[in-house]
Amino acid sequence: DELNDLIETFMGDLVGDEVFNRYGERFPLLIKIIDPLDYLSIQVHPDDELAQEIGLHNGKTEMWYVMHAEKDANLASGFNRDITPQEFENAIKDKSLGDMLNYEKVQNDDVFFIPARKIHALGAGCMVAEIQQTSDTSYRVYDWDRIDRFGMQRQLHIDEALATINF
């Protein structure tokens, strides 16, 4: 909350009038350091237009800067071919979605732009600084059948993803 307090006090002087007028006291960027031990969930995020249509402040576009990559580290970004929404749904049901993704090998200092509406997942051995729009909205499409500490699979958001992904 300290950053929000600074924005409230100094308003446009801190972030610029245009940014303050658009985002108010809500800082528009979120920066995370992520170092996954396994593939993260396959997910997608809405863009600003879709987010506002469903009552959210903004969408989520991301950028990953690879701080450290193990020898075989990779990530998934987009599909490896054109697919239809029906093919997407079928691949989720038969657990073959991973076969449709575009995998990219990563190296130290690589940069990846992940626009909103693009399906993606960060792989193991790929420590990144993630710079993103401030948003908590993620539509999880597939979680590799993992079980949480309560013995349950995490919730998926297939309908939301279908409405979000650019096919």
PLM regions: where:
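Transition-metal
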Residues: 1-83, 144-167
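Conserved metal-binding segment of the jelly-roll/cupin
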Residues: 42-45, 105-124, 133
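A short hydrophobic beta-strand segment most commonly corresponding to one strand
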Residues: 62-64, 121-145
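Active-site glycine-rich loop that binds ribose-phosphate moieties when present
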Residues: 83-113
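Generic secondary-structure boundary/loop-capping signal
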Residues: 3-4, 28-31, 85, 94, ...
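Short, well-ordered, mixed-charge alpha-helical segments that flank or form enzyme active sites
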Residues: 50-51, 72-77, 83-88, 114-115, ...
